[in-house]
Amino acid sequence: MSHRLPPPLQPGDRVYAIAPSGCLRSQLIRGRSELDAYRQGVEIWRQRGYCVEIDPDCEAQWGYLAGTDAQRRQQLDRAWQDPGIKAILCARGGYGASRLLEDWVRPQTDSPPKWLVGFSDITALLWSIYNEGIAGVHAPVLTSLSAEPDWSVRRLFDWVEGRTIPPLQGRGWGGGTVCGTLLPGNLTVATALLGTKVQPDLEGAILAFEDVGEAPYRIDRLLTQWR
């Protein structure tokens, strides 16, 4: 299956913030609250010239989730159905996106595909649209954007605005050269999606996993599941 990139963004475009996973917490983490970090992330997009609109339920809370499943599905629907919205910005990861996919079908519209921006738990949504031939961007959520180094923020905006970006940094353990479709994802979330309808066709895919705060034995267990 070939995958379409959404049209490049331009300053002045409308972008929409949603919280499809965990709720925004007010307690301090490393000296600041997630709410503060989220608002700083919104401000970075606004400083780039984008019209950031925030879903009315974006700061909702239902236990550890950002509202009930129905509320969070409605956030997704509002974002996808508005033809003027060019990108969907996820507020944070955590947990909860995969719950939405049990009873949610992306609204079909005549407009071009939108950018879906996020990582961590947002992997479930990114892989869901990947199955429809739409490429998203595995990138910082709003709560983490302001903590990113300048080069990382530049790379995000260069990519969604249609500019060429330099090759990925780092070196693989196994060596060699491969060619395929790059499919990033959170290791824990991606492993949970194995064997479900959301699991993409992995033939020819180059998997790029991320995770944080997991003990080595848990990483070992998760990777073993992929053998």
Task: Set out the residue ranges of the language-model regions.
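Conserved anion/nucleotide-ligand pocket segment
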Residues: 134-195
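Structural motif
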Residues: 87-89, 117, 206-208
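N-terminal glycine-rich "phosphate-gripper" loop used for MgATP/nucleotide binding
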Residues: 88-98, 119
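Short, acidic/small-residue loops that bind anionic groups at enzyme active sites
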Residues: 104-129, 135-142
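ATP/NTP phosphate-donor binding region
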Residues: 1-84
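Short glycine-rich anion-binding loops that position phosphate/pyrophosphate groups of nucleotides
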Residues: 23, 92-95, 214
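Internal helical hairpin/lid segments
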Residues: 201-227
